[in-house]
């Protein structure tokens, strides 16, 4: 049998319980259902680290007529006021709180008297429960920490609820924000297998740590995660007693790759125009990245598109929870973002092409529907990814370029048997900083469809382009650089963090003498902080060599 045909059959078999529709473009057929049921929610029941700006969505097996009286959203201060709008002919109800939810708080959503000709819709456990994240930078410590003690809040995958795999990355959420300079792979943080340190990429931001092994782990041999007490929070406090967790990686082979298209909302129209394709979950334009902030206004949005190469684990070995991954280096590219001063006055330039790069393998799972045991209920999809967000125009990159860790998409997957395609719809929230002064937010309505003809589907492009220095700070404004300001190198694409080595591939001198410095990677940038900080009347030089590479291994064009 042709391998590409086998891929389609394998992918369809994974979702065979999901059914396929012949009516609406991306809905499951519920014609044989005996009663109306909830089939999806965002956030999912039990989800943590939810953005306070997130919508709350409930999706039903049938169209329903609802208003705010049919839902109760309860938080730490009692009932939350919100508005409701429908999507997909009434199959989805989107609740928008009148103001942002409280940080680090528990919320519960219940349904009230949603009656249809097919019965009353209900949530099996009575409510959808979720927790919001702690506050981000610029807020008091009490709001930025989940608890008064510094420790590990969660590890994913945990090996229980979600299986740990031979291609798993490890995502940790801490209770308090980290001092990133104390989180050093191979020193204060390690993964070991068979007594050897596993080569891995480490990414740190806020309360999040991502550990992405460079190579596949060996199945059948335990992997141990260790954090020493050398890991510190922003306030200089150590991780008392450290932290240890052991995993047993499961074999996901043989795998198949399913090529999916993330098509634009419209080939010609913009995301904010009438008539573009919308998400059945939210009713918003698909594959658009909106950014809402006081500095930007609420009309800043980029239309994204690209191909996603989803690698599926061997389904017979994972009948209930099927793992998948999207390889690092995957790209989504999009239209320019408008740059406005105060969200209103045009700045006279746009961002140029917007690129979203997968910094590591995005890990995900297709899970049994948590709300319905009907064989036609769609599978739940969870996908976690670390991405770099950058723009073509460097003047705009100062506002938008950054790394976003552990972005979580929650959706569902169905099999359209008439098209011969697997269809994914998902929702997530991104919260990038704008100019380092404000946290913007955007609700992503992600949509992908596998190519029906996998034999002739696109192949993943090989990156053979070397990263170049696109801009740097202070650049031509050296006389405006203040003591204590960082030196920032902006490259044309994200870099491999393991190749940026202080005193080797990256050097800083002051009046010709080497100086110590701290640094971190953010998006396509290296942010350098000399130790001691920049001094008046001192000539500094920064040099990087071709030992620095992009995430595909292409060497940089060295420069001083």
Question: Model-derived features: where do they sit?
Answer:
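C-terminal motif of bacterial Sec signal peptides marking the signal peptidase cleavage site
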Residues: 15-17
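Aromatic sugar-binding surface patches on proteins
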Residues: 89-95, 205-211, 522-528
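Surface-exposed, short loops/turns at beta-strand junctions within beta-sandwich domains
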Residues: 99-105, 215-221, 532-538
């Amino acid at each position: 049998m042709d391998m590409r045909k086998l891929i389609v059959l394998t992918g369809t078999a994974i979702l065979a319980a999901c059914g396929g529709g012949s009516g609406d473009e991306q809905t499951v057929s519920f014609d044989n259902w005996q009663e109306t049921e909830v089939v999806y929610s965002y956030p999912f029941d039990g989800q943590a680290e939810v953005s306070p700006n997130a919508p709350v969505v409930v999706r039903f097996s049938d169209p329903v007529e609802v208003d705010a009286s049919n839902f109760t959203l309860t938080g730490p201060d009692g009932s939350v006021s919100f508005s409701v709008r429908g999507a997909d002919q009434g199959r989805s109800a989107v609740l928008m709180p009148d103001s942002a939810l409280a940080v680090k708080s528990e919320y519960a959503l219940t349904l009230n008297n949603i009656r249809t000709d097919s019965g009353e819709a209900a949530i099996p456990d009575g409510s959808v429960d979720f927790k919001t994240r702690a506050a981000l930078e610029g807020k008091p410590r009490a709001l930025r920490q989940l608890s008064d003690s510094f420790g590990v809040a969660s590890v994913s995958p945990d090996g229980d609820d979600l299986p740990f795999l031979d291609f798993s990355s490890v995502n940790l959420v801490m209770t308090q924000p980290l001092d990133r300079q104390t989180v050093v792979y191979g020193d204060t943080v390690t993964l070991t297998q068979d007594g050897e340190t596993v080569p891995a990429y480490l990414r740190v931001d806020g309360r999040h740590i991502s550990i992405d092994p460079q190579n596949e782990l060996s199945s059948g041999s335990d992997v141990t995660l260790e954090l020493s007490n050398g890991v510190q929070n922003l306030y200089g406090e150590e991780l008392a007693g450290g932290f240890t967790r052991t995993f047993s990686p499961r074999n996901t082979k043989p795998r198949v790759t399913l090529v999916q298209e993330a098509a634009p909302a419209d080939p010609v129209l913009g995301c904010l125009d009438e008539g573009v394709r919308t998400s059945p979950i939210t009713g918003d334009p698909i594959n658009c990245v909106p950014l809402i902030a006081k500095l930007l206004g609420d009309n800043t949005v980029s239309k994204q598109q690209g191909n996603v190469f989803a690698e599926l684990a061997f389904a017979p070995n994972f009948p209930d929870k099927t793992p998948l991954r999207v390889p690092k280096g995957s790209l989504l590219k999009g239209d320019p973002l408008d740059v406005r001063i105060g969200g209103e006055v045009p700045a006279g330039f746009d961002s140029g092409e917007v690129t979203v790069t997968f910094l590591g393998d995005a890990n995900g799972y297709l899970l049994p529907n948590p709300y319905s045991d009907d064989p036609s209920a769609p599978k739940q999809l969870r996908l976690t990814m670390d991405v770099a967000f950058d723009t073509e125009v460097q003047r705009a990159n100062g506002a938008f370029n950054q790394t976003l860790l552990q972005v979580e998409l929650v959706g569902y997957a169905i099999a359209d048997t008439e098209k011969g395609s697997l269809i994914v719809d998902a929702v997530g929230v991104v919260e990038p900083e704008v100019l380092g002064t404000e946290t913007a937010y955007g609700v992503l309505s992600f949509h992908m469809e596998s190519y029906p003809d996998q034999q002739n589907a696109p192949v993943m492009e090989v990156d053979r382009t070397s990263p170049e220095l696109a801009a740097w700070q202070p650049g031509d404004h050296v006389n405006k650089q203040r003591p204590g300001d960082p030196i920032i190198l902006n490259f044309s694409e994200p870099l491999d963090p393991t190749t940026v080595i202080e005193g080797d591939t990256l050097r800083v001198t002051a009046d010709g003498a080497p100086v110590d410095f701290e640094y971190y990677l953010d998006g396509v940038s290296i942010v350098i902080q000399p130790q001691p900080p920049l001094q008046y009347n001192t000539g500094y030089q920064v040099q990087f060599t071709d030992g620095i590479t992009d995430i595909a291994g292409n060497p940089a064009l060295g420069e001083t």
